[in-house]
Amino acid sequence: MSHPVVHFEVVGKDGKKLQEFYSQLFDWKIDANNPMNYGMVPPEDSGLGGGIGAGQDMGPGHVTFYVEVEDLEAHLKKVESLGGKTVMPPMAVPGGPEIAMFADPEGHVIGLAKAGAG
């Protein structure tokens, strides 16, 4: 796969409650010891790491995944040329990668993560 899925995310109104739910449901070890209280789920043997937390706008929430790419701006331009739209321009995550988000033509929101960052 030339652009692997590298992260999943579950975001909702009550990040702490979601972290407790998924921790108990799947026995995940979730570390939310960071300024954003964003619960990091480390990858295990054959799995993919991710995060669980509260949304900035405290809206209904979302579930998404992040795809690794070399150039965020170039991929956002490609998204728009294919009928999608940029939802969040590139931004640096403290202690993590540079990320961006887009919506496909049907409105599904997908994340991009810069390769080699974070």
Predicted regions and their residues:
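N-terminal beta-strand motif that seeds the catalytic metal site of vicinal oxygen chelate
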Residues: 1-19, 46-47, 62-65, 114-118
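Vicinal oxygen chelate
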Residues: 5-13, 56-80, 82-118
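Conserved beta-strand positions that form and line the central face of beta-propeller blades
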Residues: 7, 40, 51, 89, ...
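Catalytic core of tubulin tyrosine ligase-like
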Residues: 22
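Conserved acetyl-CoA-binding loop of GNAT-fold acetyltransferases
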Residues: 25-30, 83-85
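Conserved short beta-strand elements that form part of the metal-binding/catalytic scaffold
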Residues: 27-61, 109-114
